[in-house]
Amino acid sequence: MELNPLKKSPSSEAVRNLREASCGPVGTPTVTNDLSENIILTSLEDLHNWARLSSLWPLLYGTACCFIEFAALIGSRFDFDRFGLVPRSSPRQADLLIVAGTVTMKMAPALVRLYEQMPDPKYVIAMGACTITGGMFSADSTTAVRGVDKLIPVDLYLPGCPPRPEAIFDAVIKLRKKVANESISERSKITQTHRYLTIPHKMKRVESKVNGQYLKAKTQLIALNPSLSEEFDQSLKEVQKISEELSSN
């Protein structure tokens, strides 16, 4: 039997090349522009923060005129739905508490109860001067809370009397940035200091200047500065004496 001279056995080099091609590591594929635009690399924490900042469900706690400015956001002129804000009527379905208006001692326990019923993570926006410091209603009132941060922790302060709808949008954008940079592990460690939950509110006593005495005072300056009363009486006597001398002559 004669072997075919044209049919030769493969060389060792060809066998080696075939083995490397079939058993070797796969080469790095080329990444096209279409592939890079359709793949996003992120972490689970960033994905969780992105989902929360895009769907903030606020609980509206309005007690005074600042709440009217927030009600203007519902209209088509501002359209707060584009931020994913869906107002809720139950604290158990909300993650954002917007306090707008004066908080009194009688309403303080109800506000704290609503905050405690909200699931974590939760955020608070103090809207308006009356909410942040007590405003003009705390000048001579013993029932107004001088700052809602004495009751619940506040994440963002929105000053104004009242703040405009554009300012409310700016506050929401700043809160979204805070949520985006937040860490789940660090959020549970945040605690509030100087928190008072008792009904007898701890606040600094401020003597009121508007106490009705200005109605009995001779001038408005004396009503604000009672120490000037003697000087005013003395100068008034001198003026009367001079006027009598002039009239006699």
Swiss-Prot record:
Spell out the subcellular localization from the entry: Cellular thylakoid membrane
One example of a Gene Ontology biological process annotation: aerobic respiration
Name the UniProt key words of this record, in alphabetical order.
4Fe-4S, Iron, Iron-sulfur, Membrane, Metal-binding, NAD, NADP, Plastoquinone, Quinone, Thylakoid, Translocase, Transport
UniProt binding sites for [4Fe-4S] cluster: C65, C66, C130, C161
Q: InterPro entries given for it?
A: NADH_UbQ_OxRdtase-like_20kDa, NADH_UQ_OxRdtase_20Kd_su
Which EC class, in a word?
translocase
Tell me what topology the record assigns in the membrane: Peripheral membrane protein
**Among its keywords, does the record have NADP?**
yes
Name the domain of life.
Bacteria
Question: What Enzyme Commission number(s) apply to this enzyme?
Answer: 7.1.1.-
SUPFAM superfamilies named among the record's database cross-references: HydA/Nqo6-like
The yes or no answer to whether the keyword Ligase is present is no
Cofactor note text: Binds 1 [4Fe-4S] cluster.
Q: Which GO terms describe its molecular function?
A: 4 iron, 4 sulfur cluster binding; iron ion binding; NADH dehydrogenase (ubiquinone) activity; quinone binding
Its UniProt entry gives the catalysed reaction(s) as: a plastoquinone + NADH + (n+1) H(+)(in) = a plastoquinol + NAD(+) + n H(+)(out); a plastoquinone + NADPH + (n+1) H(+)(in) = a plastoquinol + NADP(+) + n H(+)(out)
Q: A GO CC term?
A: respiratory chain complex I
Under the subunit heading, UniProt states:
NDH-1 can be composed of about 15 different subunits; different subcomplexes with different compositions have been identified which probably have different functions.
- Official protein name in the record: NAD(P)H-quinone oxidoreductase subunit K
- Source organism of the structure: Prochlorococcus marinus (strain NATL2A)
